[in-house]
């Protein structure tokens, strides 16, 4: 049997590998060695008691079993950089509390950023690090201004599901990201994710794809490995309220719009010469189909409620 307690006041996390029990398993050790890039671990305590043949001292339900032994690790890590998955931006300036009990690893944080997207809360769990198919499950919330969110998207696998529409997108204004990641430790390229981005009065445009400036955007964009969607979104276009819905279809992203067309709308886009000859208002609908480097816009209206005068052949009453 072994009865060991190690206390490490301060240590560079890249050097903690000297203290990892080999019984953690090849998959877990590889992830620890390649993912913890830098940082300072403080007040690290490692306790191992029992026969190492029974490590990590859990029962059949993967619960700590004191009759078998004890394995616990606690540590507070500050200023760290962590590479949690291939192709994803690193977590930087990351302060995190680490707790290991039996075969379960728990990570908690409220400090750090991902490409300047400020972390509000972070929790990660590896339920059983001894399994060959061990997973790290992460729940993450960030305060993300839209320009910083777009930068993160364009430097992550989420860019693929955006069908080429995010690359030249410009954005500003507040928002919040909720993201769940499931990371197989033996293949960090095979991450599954699902998330949502809350527009809290943001603005965006994509001149390359003829998407005009949308301001005061409010709504919830939902996305995963395969799709994106937004229902019942709201925005302002040319000083007029607008309803928005977004979905993916085949190799394109489709944005459906509906709004009100009146003289103010026309003045904003075409000038007073046109708007002075328009009275009333009418509803209109539009569909903007966006794909990599291409866009297609279809607009329609029945003109009910609108009168157009003194415009040659366009007179309508």
Per-range role (PLM):
Residues 11, 78-80, 117, 202, ...:
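Solvent-exposed loop/turn tips at the surfaces of repeat/solenoid architectures
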């Amino acid at each position: 049997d072994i009865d060991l307690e190690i206390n490490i006041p301060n240590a560079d996390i890249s050097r903690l590998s000297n203290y990892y029990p080999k019984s953690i398993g090849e998959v877990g050790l590889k992830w620890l060695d390649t993912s913890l890039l830098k940082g300072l671990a403080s007040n690290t305590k490692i306790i191992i008691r029992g026969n190492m043949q029974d490590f990590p001292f859990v029962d059949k339900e993967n619960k700590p079993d004191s009759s078998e032994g004890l394995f616990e690790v606690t540590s507070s890590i500050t200023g760290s950089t962590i590479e949690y998955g291939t192709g994803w931006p690193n977590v930087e300036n990351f302060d995190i509390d680490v707790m290991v009990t039996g075969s379960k690893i728990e990570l908690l944080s409220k400090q750090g950023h991902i490409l300047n997207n400020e972390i509000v809360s972070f929790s990660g769990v590896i339920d059983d690090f001894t399994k060959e198919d061990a997973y790290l499950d992460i729940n993450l919330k960030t305060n993300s201004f839209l320009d910083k969110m777009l930068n993160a998207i364009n430097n992550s696998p989420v860019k693929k599901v955006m069908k080429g529409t995010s690359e030249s997108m410009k954005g500003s204004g507040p928002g919040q990201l909720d993201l769940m990641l499931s990371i197989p430790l033996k293949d960090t390229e095979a991450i599954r994710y699902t998330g949502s981005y809350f527009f809290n009065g943001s603005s965006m445009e994509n001149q390359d794809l003829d998407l005009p400036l949308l301001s005061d955007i409010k709504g919830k964009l939902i996305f995963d490995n395969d799709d994106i969607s937004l229902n019942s979104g709201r925005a302002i276009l040319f000083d007029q309220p607008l309803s928005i819905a977004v979905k993916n279809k085949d190799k394109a992203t489709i944005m459906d719009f509906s709004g009100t067309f009146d003289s103010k709308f026309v003045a904003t886009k075409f000038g007073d010469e046109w708007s002075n000859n328009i009275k009333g208002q009418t509803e209109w609908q539009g569909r903007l189909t966006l794909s990599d480097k291409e866009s297609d816009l279809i607009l329609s209206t029945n003109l009910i409620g609108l009168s157009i005068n003194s415009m040659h052949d366009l007179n309508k009453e």
